[in-house]
From Swiss-Prot:
HAMAP family cross-referenced by the UniProt entry: Spermidine_synth
Presence of keyword Cytoplasm: yes
Entry binding sites for S-methyl-5'-thioadenosine: 36, 111, 143-144, 169
Protein name, entry field: Polyamine aminopropyltransferase
Upper taxonomic lineage: Bacteria, Bacillati, Cyanobacteriota, Cyanophyceae, Synechococcales
Catalysed reaction equations from the record: S-adenosyl 3-(methylsulfanyl)propylamine + putrescine = S-methyl-5'-thioadenosine + spermidine + H(+)
Organism the protein comes from: Prochlorococcus marinus (strain NATL2A)
Residues engaged in binding spermidine: 67, 91
Family per record: Belongs to the spermidine/spermine synthase family.
GO biological process annotation, one example: spermidine biosynthetic process
Amino acid sequence: MNYKLKTRSEWLDEYHQGVRYGLQGKLILEESSPFQKITIYESKRYGKALLLDDCWMTAEKSEKCYHECLIHPALCCSTQIENILIIGGGDGGSARECLKYKEVKSIDLVEIDLRVIELSQKYLPTIGGDAWSDSRLNLQIKNGIDWVKHTQENSYDVIIIDGADPIGPSKELFSNSFLKDCKRILKQGGVLATQSESPESFQKIHINIVKVLREIFDYADPMYGSVSIYPSGLWSWTFASMKQQRYMHPKKSRVKEISENCQIWSTRWQQGAFNSIPAFIERELAKK
């Protein structure tokens, strides 16, 4: 992936494979942590935004299009949801969505870069919301790969992989060995959820993620939606489970509990998102 970020007057642009994505606004902060370049930008259209290594990660007024779609197909459908693992997710949005469920007793949020959390809390506090002060949230400033590798089997009901694009510290979150470890520590009846890139801008990566998950788990299926600040605007999330497609069957009690507080996700939306797989992707996934 060839990313390049440039500023032209009041615009901040992300260049990717001959396409330019830009938001108008002003630069607030730019620094380098031990792991990556971090940028905070205030856009006129989407509010404050977070960029990592010059890639748009999240923005105040568009983040629900991403976080609700990553979290609720997993938590509404998993057999149990008491113990949750989030890898990445330093902006707090995934934790916020998980904590909408009263059944959730504990969330381990494993983020490698403390500065992502600190700057998100300071400049984008509405994304994490009350999650940061919720006693059920346990912050672990550690390497997610190592955390999963050294965790006992059958430890979590749901695993959420909320990493950046497969460059920098997030690259190994898409590896075969890491996903096998995730399967090992996921309880029977559990669901794994991961962002799985754009089927248009990152076609090969997207297809590979789904295929690897299908090799490791009994079932894995992508769903598709719109995240306007990401390359092409078309994004995907992939869900995996054993024995049955648990992520296809939301539990009515959980739907009732959280649906009124969702802006994007609904059972109807979820069904449509799973059914909206592009034909060319479906053909590629069918190839051996």
